[in-house]
């Protein structure tokens, strides 16, 4: 029967229906689908993000069919071309410092060569013909970091990335205090991520709208160069608001945006989705939800939750504090069950904290 896959749930159902057996011949790579089942299940359980989930499925099918790869076999003329020798020298130098042992991380100083030196049967391992670099647009608290982590996990399991390595950085991790040191600092971070994923959260903070920051220019130019130089060895994922990324990141280098060939956009959560996120966090923490406030309560108060999922996490934390006070001295059957009173009191604490944060910020403006 023909197999149609449109959604993540279709892949999960397929692995349920066909357990992997190495003695059975399949017309699809069922073993690989089983390998990515766990991160796909986590992604499928995330609230909302239907467009992102569909795009991820399309990417997976594309890569599983190996349409991203250039020809595996090289002629003698190909091997002796300037372009190939330049790449070979680059990778040989890289592998002397960062070599890969299966089942472990990259080890400095090991003697591993990525290329078979036999000219009669010279092959390239996992040579991606496409950029892997990705941009995730969206406001804070909408799951951008979690999506990035799952992408890294999935792509390492199917062999597109050589190791399951994920490094999250911000401006302070890339930009140094003196001109000239920023490029070195940025290159060191990039080399540390080779074979895996470099995730730059709030990448717009690297630059500014005026474009006058020499440190930012140095950092972003170094990133841009590395996007091509390590095209087959690195995935860079950036995240942030679309307008700010366009103004404060992509505008620094004309060739930058075209290197990010995959893009996703996380959307603001609805009141119903905020409720689902809170209930999910409660249940996953081993607690139970018994509040009857319902959708209307979240609809009335959703404007207070500008950071969406992150604010639901904060609300749950404060609800546990309020719950602890409410059940003090009561029997065990009342414990670890969040009710309406806990949520209402937690919301008051949440608003008080926001007021204090705003007051502190305003006072600091005059220091």
Language-model segments: which ranges?
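Dynamic helix-loop-helix/coil hinge segments at AAA+ ATPase domain boundaries and subdomain interfaces
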Residues: 34-57, 64-76, 172, 176-180, ...
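Walker A/P-loop
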Residues: 77-90, 117, 121-164, 188-191
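Conserved catalytic network of the ASCE P-loop NTPase/AAA+ motor domain
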Residues: 127-129, 140, 158-162, 189-199, ...
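Canonical AAA+ ATPase core
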Residues: 149, 204-211, 220-275, 284
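Conserved C-terminal "switch" segment of AAA+ ATPases
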Residues: 158-163, 244, 248-251, 257-258, ...
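Short glycine-rich substrate-engagement loop in P-loop NTPases that contacts/grips substrate
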Residues: 163-193
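Flexible beta-alpha connector loops of hexameric P-loop NTPases
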Residues: 171-181, 205-217, 264
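C-terminal engagement/docking regions of AAA+ P-loop ATPases
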Residues: 326-367
């Amino acid at each position: 029967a023909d197999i149609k896959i449109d959604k993540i749930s279709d892949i999960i159902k397929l692995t349920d229906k066909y357990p992997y057996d190495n003695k059975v011949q399949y017309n699809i790579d069922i073993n690989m689908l089983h390998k990515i089942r766990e991160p796909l299940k986590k992604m499928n359980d995330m609230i909302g993000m239907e467009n992102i989930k569909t795009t991820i499925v399309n990417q997976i099918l594309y890569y599983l069919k190996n349409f991203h790869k250039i020809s595996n076999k090289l002629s003698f003329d190909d091997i002796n071309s300037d372009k190939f020798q330049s790449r070979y020298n680059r990778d040989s130098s890289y592998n002397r410092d960062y070599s890969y042992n299966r089942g472990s991380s990259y080890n400095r100083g090991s003697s591993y060569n990525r290329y078979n030196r036999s000219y009669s049967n010279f092959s390239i391992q996992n040579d991606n013909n496409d950029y892997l670099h990705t941009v995730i647009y969206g406001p804070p608290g909408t799951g951008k970091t979690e999506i990035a982590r799952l992408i890294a996990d999935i792509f390492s399991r199917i062999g597109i990335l050589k190791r399951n390595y994920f490094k999250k950085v911000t401006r302070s991790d890339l930009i140094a205090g003196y001109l000239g040191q920023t490029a070195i600092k940025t290159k060191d971070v990039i080399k540390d991520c080779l074979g895996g994923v470099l995730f730059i959260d709030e990448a717009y903070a690297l630059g500014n709208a005026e474009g006058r920051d020499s440190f930012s220019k140095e950092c972003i130019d170094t990133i841009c160069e590395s996007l091509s130089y390590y095209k087959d060895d690195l995935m860079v994922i950036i995240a942030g608001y679309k307008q700010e990324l366009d103004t404060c990141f992509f505008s620094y280098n004309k060739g930058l945006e075209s290197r990010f060939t995959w893009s996703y956009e996380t959307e603001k959560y609805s009141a119903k989705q905020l409720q689902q996120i809170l209930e999910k966090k409660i249940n996953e923490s081993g607690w139970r939800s018994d509040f009857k406030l319902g959708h209307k309560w979240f609809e009335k108060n959703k404007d207070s939750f500008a950071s969406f999922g992150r604010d639901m996490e904060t609300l749950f934390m404060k609800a546990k504090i309020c719950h602890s006070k409410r059940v003090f001295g009561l029997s065990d059957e009342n414990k670890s069950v969040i009710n309406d009173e806990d949520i209402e009191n937690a919301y008051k604490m949440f608003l008080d904290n926001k007021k204090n944060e705003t007051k502190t910020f305003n006072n600091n403006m005059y220091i």
